[in-house]
Structures are given as structure tokens and as C-alpha cells.
């Protein structure tokens, strides 16, 4: 159905932190992707790492993240890893690593866990090592509109959500809200459809980490 609409699917490998089990199935999983036209995967490691005693940011897991990226490169598959270690430029060596989460992304905003200044700091910390899948694009900021029992509020605006597509660099961007919310603001959603994913030139015009940031970017291969 997606192919009939000209849409490519991205597979999600949520490992539930069962890493050895994931490694045992990597070749079959990647081959299944190739056979069925998937060329990208979003991997996740939610929970305490199995085997017990290993941790998300330890050497053992760092070796695993690298192994998964190398294995994906063998199958010409792009990787967007969540709950992984903050990158340190590895995407230069393995450009199929098109993004990582590796910091508090948009999901924490619904938990009330990100301060409003959080995204003025990330470009000088997390994003130094590589692109970040921040998953912006939340248009409905009142969580009780979806779940009456949840009175949390995303401390943001539509304008700020759109700005994140430029400020939080990633060659893979998400539209993280539901279609019904985008249908209410089609003019704003048009920006998400049109905004570039990669850039020829970037200028940080002004910034005070923790307070504000102004970025100008030139879209790759165009005059935009």
C-alpha cells in the first residue's frame, strides 16, 4: 500500500535491550529488509541491558552499536539508533549512520522533563558529534486532548517546533505528531514537507547557550 502511494517504509527494531538476542537475528533481519524494500531502520534499546551488568554507555554496548552499524552497511541499510551512545563523529566513517537520539528528545517534553532552553544547549553539546533525531513536529501541546487522564503539557509552540527542523540537524527528520493534528494546521505542516534535510552552509549568527540561538542555513544544492 505504501509503495502505491510512493512512500518508503522504515523498519523499527525495538530490542527491549535484549542485545545478544538482537545480534543473533541481525543478519536475518537485515536480509528481510533488503528482500522487502526497506533501506533504513530505527533501532531502540529501551530498558536495562541484557546481559545484566552491561550499561547503555559502557564499552560492551559501544562495541555493539558499532557492530550493528557495520553490519547494516554490509546490507546497504541506514541506521537511526535510539538510546545509543552520544556519537563522536563516527558517521564520517560510516555515513549509513544517518542519525542518533542519544540525548533527551521531544518525547521528554511530554513528560515535563525538558526545560524550554534545552534546545539552545544541544547544538553546542550533543550535536557536535553528529546529527540528532530529536523527533520534532508536535502541533498539539496539550496531552489531555489525546488522553484525558494526562494533564501534561508540551512547553512549546508550533513556531518553535518548526524551528527545530533547522536548529536540530539531521538528514532524517520525523513528523512526530498524528495526522489529525497536522490537518488542523496545513500551512505549518507545509513547512515540514518543504524544509531541507541537508545543508551546504551553516552560520550561527548569535547564541547564548541556555537562552537563545539563531542559525542560518543554505539548503544543499539549491539557493534556498
Set out the residue ranges of the language-model regions:
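Aromatic- and carboxylate-enriched substrate-binding clefts and catalytic-loop regions
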Residues: 1-153
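Residue-level marker of positions within ordered structural domains that often coincide
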Residues: 139, 172, 221
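C-terminal catalytic/substrate-binding lobe primarily of soluble NAD(P)-dependent oxidoreductases
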Residues: 142, 147, 155, 188-195
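Residues embedded in well-ordered secondary-structure elements
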Residues: 156, 205, 216-217
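Catalytic cores of secreted or luminal carbohydrate-active enzymes
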Residues: 159-209
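Carbohydrate-binding surface patches
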Residues: 209-224
Amino acid at each position: 500500500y505504501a509503495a502505491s502511494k510512493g512512500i518508503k517504509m522504515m523498519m523499527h527494531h525495538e530490542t527491549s535491550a535484549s542485545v545478544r538476542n538482537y545480534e543473533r537475528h541481525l543478519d536475518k533481519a537485515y536480509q528481510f529488509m533488503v528482500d522487502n524494500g526497506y533501506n533504513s531502520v530505527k533501532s531502540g534499546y529501551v530498558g536495562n541491558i541484557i546481559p545484566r551488568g552491561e550499561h547503555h554507555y559502557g564499552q560492551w554496548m559501544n562495541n555493539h552499536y558499532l557492530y550493528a552499524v557495520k553490519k547494516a552497511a554490509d546490507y546497504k541499510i541506514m541506521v537511526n539508533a535510539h538510546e545509543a551512545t552520544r556519537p563522536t563523529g563516527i558517521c564520517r566513517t560510516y555515513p549509513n549512520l544517518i542519525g542518533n537520539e542519544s540525548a533527551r528528545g521531544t518525547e521528554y517534553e511530554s513528560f515535563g522533563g525538558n526545560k524550554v532552553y534545552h534546545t539552545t544547549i544541544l547544538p553546542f553539546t550533543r550535536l557536535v558529534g553528529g546529527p540528532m533525531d530529536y523527533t520534532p513536529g508536535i502541533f498539539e501541546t496539550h496531552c489531555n486532548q489525546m488522553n484525558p487522564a494526562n494533564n501534561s503539557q508540551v512547553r512549546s509552540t508550533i513556531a518553535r517546533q518548526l524551528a527545530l527542523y533547522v536548529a536540530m540537524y539531521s538528514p532524517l527528520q520525523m513528523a512526530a505528531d498524528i495526522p489529525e493534528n497536522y490537518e488542523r494546521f496545513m500551512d505549518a505542516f507545509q513547512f515540514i514537507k518543504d524544509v531541507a534535510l541537508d545543508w551546504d552552509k551553516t552560520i550561527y549568527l548569535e547564541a547564548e547557550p541556555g537562552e537563545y540561538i539563531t542559525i542560518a542555513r543554505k539548503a544543499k544544492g539549491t539557493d534556498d
